[in-house]
A protein has these predicted regions:
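Canonical tetratricopeptide repeat
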Residues: 60, 94-95, 128-129, 161-162, ...
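Canonical positions in the second alpha-helix
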Residues: 46-47, 80-82, 114-116, 148-149, ...
Length: 253
């Protein structure tokens, strides 16, 4: 188990290594052993304690923070690495992934393109680059990249992203077929994706039935309030809602 005290120490190191960047959130990790992301972050922070200008350690820390879903910290680490080593393609990919997940897709796509020009293969970026395209409403490019990612071993999250993108494109048959194996396996996030996809396709009642009966009570209730609005959103807004949980204000719909 990683204690709060240890995470607090990590936060201090982050503040030292990333000048002015948001600190890593302190939280109790209730697990018998630290996960891979936590171990990777702990190792990177130890190296930064010895040398705060260790670019590789900063990049490792940024990637670990992404694994732990601490996007602000990841941006801080990658930003500091970019100051020390401008134009590093690994930094471009890391920042692009973080910007995608913080709903900054235009900046992300620019950085993905920079990384590609620097020689980073699309297979290394396909999953998150696909999401960035979905977040600007380009579902065709997104789906091409999701399939590339799946051909190279990407997992269930990419399957769910592809299915939702197909629903956004209006292809219900493909949406259902893509999601079915995960639904058969009882994958709860797949049921969430199904609810969003059905709502996008105009079947809000079935979507709300799923939200209210299959998903955890709190999540289902929060989702149900938005499902009626999904067909009225732009493609980019639908992708942001279904993938990131980012909704426009109802007054602006």
């Amino acid at each position: 188990m990683i204690s709060t005290r240890r995470l607090a120490a990590a936060t201090v190191l982050l503040a030292l290594a990333v000048q002015g960047a948001p600190a890593l959130a302190q939280r109790e990790i209730v697990q018998p052993l630290p996960g891979a992301g936590e171990q990777k972050l702990s190792d990177a922070l130890s190296r930064l304690a010895r040398n705060s200008q260790d670019v590789t350690a900063l990049l490792d820390a940024g990637e670990a923070a992404l694994e732990l879903d601490d996007i602000d910290a990841a941006i801080g680490f990658f930003g500091r690495a970019n100051e020390l080593s401008p134009g590093n393609p690994r930094t471009s990919v890391g920042l692009a992934r973080a910007y995608t997940r913080s709903h900054r897709p235009i900046e992300a796509l620019r950085l993905f393109a920079e990384a590609e020009r620097a020689g980073v293969p699309d297979t290394r970026m396909a999953q998150d680059r696909g999401l960035a395209f979905d977040l600007v409403g380009d579902a065709a490019s997104a789906q091409q990249l999701y399939r590339l990612a799946l051909d190279n071993g990407a997992g269930a999250e990419t399957v769910r992203r592809l299915a939702l993108s197909q629903a956004i494109s209006g292809d219900r048959e493909a949406f259902e077929a893509t999601l079915l194996p995960l639904l058969r396996d009882g994958d709860v996030p797949a049921f969430r994706t199904r609810a969003f996809g059905l709502a996008v396709l105009g079947d809000a009642e079935e979507a709300k039935d799923i939200a209210n009966t299959v998903l955890p009570a709190g999540l289902g209730a929060r989702m149900a309030a938005y499902l009626d609005y999904m067909p009225r959103l732009t493609r980019a807004q639908q992708a942001a809602a279904g993938n990131l949980g980012v909704f426009p204000r109802t007054s602006s719909i």
